[in-house]
């Protein structure tokens, strides 16, 4: 079914006409552009969330200014469960307040079927911690920490069938002395090739090079050592397969603009895992709504847009300007994203973005009248010329709530007027009434005992300490195993 938005549009005889913007195929992906204050979220993103819940979509929502979008999704779901055959469950990831957050392990071993999954997870984490690395793929000091952390993730996946395969355990294991972690990991045949560059440097006595490789992974990841973050990412209260027909989910993941540097990598890991898990056949229709896209890096986003249509995944990306996308996703990947999206909404944008959009909307044959006056007479000439349908100057001067854009159609659902220049009309009074009845996202984990004492801080700290003890025990047990195995004990002699 189409996602609909009321509009007013000047299309004939210089008159405004009431009508609708019909997104008949949201699975061809959508982009919402506009400078801050242009009305992206209020006019478009919020409508997407509400209408897709009404139409029975499973959903993943990245909420940069948590809990703005999450509150809308939570309350709209409460009032529109009738759109689903199996009622979905509502889940929240929130690092700021563990009591209002579910716990989810993005490195769940059930979804880590190959070492390439470990590499993709590591890659996503590293690029969210070091955004400039996106343009340096293949460089020595980009690949080294990525491969090292991927090897650690896969070691934890194969160790005791993934019992300790979590992001916090991986960070703690990385921070153990390399004289301990390299013998342990190299005792596993599936990791030998991954670790060979590090082992070669170790055996050659290139300690400075080795320490540099390890430090390039340790230093950025040290920013993420947080008891609250460890709490949320170290247990499995739900899985990330949001479009599972038997267990549909509405998942909201919240960021905090003040802690973006810390939370960005963890959230990027969730995003990358979700993008891969949901893009499969035989699942429920689902939506991935990411407002303020440049605040995170999502590996595989271009591939998702290109392939999601056949798997019924509707992608909506919100950001301010194409230059943001080019800066954070490299020029090549940004162009793929821009050119493969079927539906586009744009509020006020300027510069190259306005020019690009104007070119996308095309040109139209327009009549021009010219009048020439001289002493004897007045002559009038009429000519035709191809001019921009919506010139860049008009896009640069759009007022708040005014949008230009285009929509894609389907076989059997033809749209003659694909391009629009309109005011998206939002019933502000109705929305205000809805918001008065909104409920807050409830407390999910109760840390308060019967006497009213809040134990959140100590329970979160206990979990943090337990993870550190888990890793100490893993290292001790593995070193003991290697020392007692005649075929492996030579690995410990490499330290001498």
Residue ranges, per PLM feature:
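P-loop NTPase motor domains
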Residues: 13-14, 21-313, 329, 395-399, ...
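Single conserved hydrophobic/aromatic residue that forms the stacking wall/gate
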Residues: 1-7, 11
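Conserved ATP-driven motor cores of ASCE-family P-loop NTPases powering translocation/secretion/packaging/pilus
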Residues: 305-307, 311-408
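Extended, low-structure N-terminal and interdomain regions
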Residues: 415-419
